[in-house]
Amino acid sequence: MTIIVDYRFPPAINAEKQAKTIAIGQTAGTWSERHSHRQKQLQQHLAEVVGIREEADGYKVARVRFPQINVENDIASLLTMIFGKYSMAGAGKVVGVYLPESYGTKAKLGITGIRQRLGVYDRPLVMAIFKPALGLSAQDHADILREVAFAGLDVIKDDEIMADLPVAPTHERLDCCRRVLEEVRQQTGRNVLYAVNVTGKADELQRKARLLVKHGANALLLNVLTYGFSVLEALASDPAIDVPIFAHPAFAGAMCAGSDTGLAYSVVLGTMMAHAGADAVLYPAAYGSLPFDPQEEGKIRDILRDRNVFPVPSAGIRPGIVPQVLGDYGRNVILNAGTGIMDHPSGPASGVRAFFEALARIEAGESFDPANLPEGALKQAILEWG
């Protein structure tokens, strides 16, 4: 079996030469007469340039086919092979990686499993982020959770910046919030997921994740790119961690934002996350608060859903843009809002209600023009943010 990788080069770069350099340098490392007696042995490890196409802007995309026998069925050895030291060679960007279906680690729960845990099958999920990100006590987290959970929220997560800090230690947050989740379940029959941020040193992370689950965590959050894909793979393949893992994109810009260097967002937040075991992946929405290419967003969405992974467009999601989100995503999406819920003029519970009002109006085919909206949470949100 093989792995296909697309590299994009600017007009000033000799794409043919660079593609051949990658095919040899990122596999056998050398291919000269001095090693002719080993050619048969080395041949099976060599990559092959299978095509080069020129785009309208003069850029060229070279396609290279790598033997799968060169890697260990994980993301770390894959990234080392396809881009490794070549990532320091100058202009050239990985814009597509095509892996066998069986490659890597599959989501343990994904879209279908998360919906089953929540008992919600016929609509997008609504998710919030604890805000302010830092400075809240464990009890503050529980008080906020109570407000939004009883308003109908499906999922809430720690802010990715919230580590295991003295102001609100992770197990204290979980303990306080777990009691609220049980209240909600007993009084409403609904389950709400709380994705607890897993942080720490490499030798502690899996133990800490297992302990969180043992103590009642029903979802986990992981900053995959700062802790490493290997951590995600380890958590996702651990039978003791039977809860969904929400993958955060923090640090992705350092790998992906360069126009002619690094890897495309769709490769890192789409392909790699989907083959490393994430159940849901957060990433910027093109219509949100961070600049993001709509084409890349669409690729990420499709790559994730092809592997049963929940897409979670984020950063600047607010009730007034729900029609745009659903137009692009349909119902299999998680609407993730931080300030779009927590900073609602009438409070976080109204922020949650505004999203559900938006979903109801879309279902009924009704206008979002403020002049046609009844007084309530949605109208307030649209007047506040558009």
From Swiss-Prot:
Catalyzes the enolization of 2,3-diketo-5-methylthiopentyl-1-phosphate (DK-MTP-1-P) into 2-hydroxy-3-keto-5-methylthiopentenyl-1-phosphate (HK-MTPenyl-1-P). Keywords: Amino-acid biosynthesis, Isomerase, Magnesium, Metal-binding, Methionine biosynthesis. Belongs to the RuBisCO large chain family. Type IV subfamily. InterPro entries: Diketo-Methiopentyl-P_enolase, RuBisCO, RuBisCO_lsu_C, RuBisCO_lsu_C_sf, RuBisCO_lsu_fd_N, RuBisCO_lsu_N_sf. The modification N6-carboxylysine is found at residue 157. The active site is at 85 (proton acceptor). Its EC number is 5.3.2.5. The keyword Phosphoprotein does not apply. The gene is mtnW. Pathway: Amino-acid biosynthesis; L-methionine biosynthesis via salvage pathway; L-methionine from S-methyl-5-thio-alpha-D-ribose 1-phosphate: step 3/6. One of its GO terms (biological process) is carbon fixation. Substrate binds at residues 131, 157-160, 248, 316, 338-339. Homodimer. Binds 1 Mg(2+) ion per subunit. Has no RuBP-carboxylation activity. This is 2,3-diketo-5-methylthiopentyl-1-phosphate enolase. Mg(2+) binds at residues 157, 159-160. It catalyses: 5-methylsulfanyl-2,3-dioxopentyl phosphate = 2-hydroxy-5-methylsulfanyl-3-oxopent-1-enyl phosphate. Its cofactor is Mg(2+). The keyword DNA repair does not apply. GO terms for molecular function: 2,3-diketo-5-methylthiopentyl-1-phosphate enolase activity; magnesium ion binding; ribulose-bisphosphate carboxylase activity. PANTHER family: RIBULOSE BISPHOSPHATE CARBOXYLASE, RIBULOSE BISPHOSPHATE CARBOXYLASE LARGE CHAIN.
